[in-house]
């Protein structure tokens, strides 16, 4: 098995500037438009736009939508620290730092319900998609004892997240929150086509019970 040596020196550097504009139409509509420009060492100048919209048709309903571009240098072994415990050999670009490029867009609808001991009773639905234009691929399926690292380079990769949340205070200072999320993550591996992204959990659920004493001196979860 090959030995990975890290000397603590990288050539990662970037500098950027960011600006945004906020528009309000009373208390029912808000729009925030942002634009970021970054210079990345070895990659040049990149622009990352983003927008956030919020609309309240009535007091009980809040609708949000947002989207934008994200850029970051990959750090393959740090981002996938679990591979170090597999005992497998690494091949490909595991020492390189490609510039990952992704677009994320989606929205949320929150409905505040007219019951419970506080105004914090609600149900919300979320959907977000992340579409990768460039990504560091970690391929566990090239060979039995090998993990291969390589750039996406025109292949497909995306993640869809669907989430539902419910929160209620049945009595004062006692909160119940339940969350369920479904993740559909697909990636196109070299020679295998579009497959489920390895090491990704499709279903996640959380149930949290919280009680707080007077003045929140003690909080129990």
Predicted regions and their residues:
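Outer-membrane beta-barrel transmembrane domain signature of Gram-negative proteins
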Residues: 1-31, 67, 150-165
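Gram-negative outer-membrane beta-barrel transporters
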Residues: 24-28, 123, 128-131, 152-221
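Hydrophobic, lipid-facing positions within transmembrane beta-strands of outer-membrane proteins
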Residues: 13-19, 31-35, 47-53, 93, ...
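Transmembrane beta-strands of outer-membrane beta-barrel pores
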Residues: 13-15, 35-41, 67-73, 82, ...
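Outer-membrane beta-barrel translocator domains and adjoining extracellular loop/strand segments
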Residues: 1-5, 43-49, 76-82, 89-91, ...
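Residue-level signature of outer-membrane beta-barrel architecture
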Residues: 21-23, 37, 45, 55, ...
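Membrane-embedded beta-barrel scaffold of Gram-negative outer-membrane proteins
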Residues: 56, 62-64, 98-153, 158
């Amino acid at each position: 098995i090959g030995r990975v040596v890290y000397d603590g020196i990288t050539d990662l550097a970037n500098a950027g500037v960011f600006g945004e504009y906020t528009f309000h139409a009373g208390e029912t509509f808000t729009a925030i438009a942002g634009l970021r420009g970054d210079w990345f060492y070895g990659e040049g100048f990149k622009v990352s736009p983003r927008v956030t919209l919020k609309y309240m048709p009535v007091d009980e309903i809040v609708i949000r939508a947002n989207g934008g571009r994200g850029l970051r240098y990959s750090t393959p072994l740090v981002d996938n620290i679990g591979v170090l415990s597999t005992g497998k050999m690494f091949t490909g670009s595991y020492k390189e730092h490609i510039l990952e490029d992704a677009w994320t867009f989606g929205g949320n609808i929150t409905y505040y319900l007219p019951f419970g001991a506080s105004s914090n009773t609600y149900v919300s639905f979320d959907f977000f998609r992340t579409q990768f234009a460039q990504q560091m691929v970690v391929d566990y399926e090239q060979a039995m004892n090998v993990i291969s690292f390589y750039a996406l380079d025109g292949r497909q990769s995306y993640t869809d997240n669907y989430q539902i949340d419910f929160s209620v205070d049945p009595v004062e200072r006692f909160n119940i929150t339940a969350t369920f999320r479904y993740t559909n993550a697909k990636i196109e591996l070299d020679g295998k086509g579009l497959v489920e992204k390895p090491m990704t959990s499709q279903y996640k659920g959380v149930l949290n019970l919280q009680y707080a004493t007077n003045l929140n001196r003690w909080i129990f979860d």
